[in-house]
Swiss-Prot record:
Pathway: Isoprenoid biosynthesis; isopentenyl diphosphate biosynthesis via DXP pathway; isopentenyl diphosphate from 1-deoxy-D-xylulose 5-phosphate: step 3/6. HAMAP family: IspE. It comes from Listeria monocytogenes serotype 4b (strain CLIP80459). It holds the Pfam family GHMP_kinases_C. InterPro entries: GHMP_kinase_C_dom, GHMP_kinase_C_sf, GHMP_kinase_N_dom, IspE, Ribosomal_Su5_D2-typ_SF, Ribsml_uS5_D2-typ_fold_subgr. It is an enzyme of class 2 (transferase). This is 4-diphosphocytidyl-2-C-methyl-D-erythritol kinase. The active site is at 10, 136. It catalyses: 4-CDP-2-C-methyl-D-erythritol + ATP = 4-CDP-2-C-methyl-D-erythritol 2-phosphate + ADP + H(+). Keywords: ATP-binding, Isoprene biosynthesis, Kinase, Nucleotide-binding, Transferase. GO terms for molecular function: 4-(cytidine 5'-diphospho)-2-C-methyl-D-erythritol kinase activity; ATP binding. Belongs to the GHMP kinase family. IspE subfamily.
Length: 293
């Protein structure tokens, strides 16, 4: 059996860290949504008991360091799977960008393996299992728009956000998420209004969504990396209704209602930033799985 499955990137419309927990993680409130910048995974069931990864991108491991490999290994051990799998990944999501590319790939792998290994797991069971690998993966299993709490693994679905344009810009730097969280001072930052964001999404209020964006991690990443702030400022100067860093960075995204204005923001970033994308929110039904027996 062979299948292919799409793994969309995500952005954080709001990201709040409330306090540091006893287990070392931060208690978070994040509103996230998937976008139509996506990787594609191709899975082939093997009779031989092995996991083979083929990543069509540089600098991405094809062994146990890869979340996809970890996802496959976890399912094999948990359900005593004797079959193997070959997974080919066609990468489009930037690496180490704050867009959950690795987490989305792992989520897609879990869903694909559930099919080709005929495990019969529900989406809820897959999401619960995914939390053993990484905090962002549960959201990526569900996709769409959702509130994530706990350390990010507790997911409450929200309506999809209204149609708009999203311009992404990633500078040629990398950011360490553990370092950013370690340096975050939760008592000394402005916190986003998560409830207002949720209400705006439920009401389909795009202006309210724009006004409610916020990310406490900007207080650390922008201070350490001034080029991230310059990208955000440039987006706003070219007409973005809102601009925010996604995750711990370094990618910044702009939210824009009109195509013409979005194109102006996009053109204003090209040449200024190494990687620039113009995308839309992910639509229901786009996260397709194709099966070939």
């Amino acid at each position: 059996m062979k299948i292919s499955i799409t793994a969309p990137a995500k952005i954080n419309l709001s990201l709040d860290a409330l306090y540091k927990r006893e287990d070392g993680y931060h208690e978070v409130e994040m509103v996230m949504t998937t976008i139509d910048l996506a990787d594609r995974l191709y899975l082939e069931r093997l009779d031989e008991d092995k996991i083979v990864l083929d990543v069509k991108a540089h600098f991405i491991p094809e062994d146990r360091r890869n979340l996809i490999y970890q996802a496959a290994l976890l399912l094999k051990k948990r359900f005593d799977v004797k079959m193997g799998v070959r997974i080919t990944i066609d990468k489009h999501i930037p690496v180490s960008a704050g867009l959950a590319g690795g987490s989305s790939d792992a989520a897609a792998a879990l869903k694909g393996l559930n099919v080709i290994w005929e495990l019969g797991l529900s989406i809820e069971e897959l999401a619960e299992i995914s939390s053993e690998i990484g905090s962002d993966i549960a959201f990526c299993v569900y996709g769409g728009t959702a509130l994530a709490t706990g350390r990010g693994e507790k997911i409450s679905a929200l309506p999809n956000i209204p149609g708009c344009w999203i311009v992404l810009a990633k500078p040629s730097i990398s950011v360490s998420t553990p370092t950013i969280y370690k340096e975050l001072q939760v008592d000394n930052v402005e916190h986003p209004d998560t409830q207002k964001m949720i209400e705006s999404i439920k009401n389909g209020d795009l202006d309210g969504i724009f006004a409610s964006t916020g990310n406490v991690l900007e207080s650390v990443t922008l201070e350490k990396n001034p080029q991230v702030k310059r990208i955000k400022d440039r987006m706003l100067a070219f007409g973005a209704e809102a601009a925010l860093m996604s995750g711990s960075g370094p990618t910044v995204f702009a939210l824009i209602k009109q195509y013409s204005r979005a194109k102006r923001v996009y053109n204003g970033l090209r040449g200024f930033c190494e990687e620039v994308y113009m995308v839309r929110p992910w639509s229901e039904g786009e996260n397709d799985t194709n099966i070939n027996n």
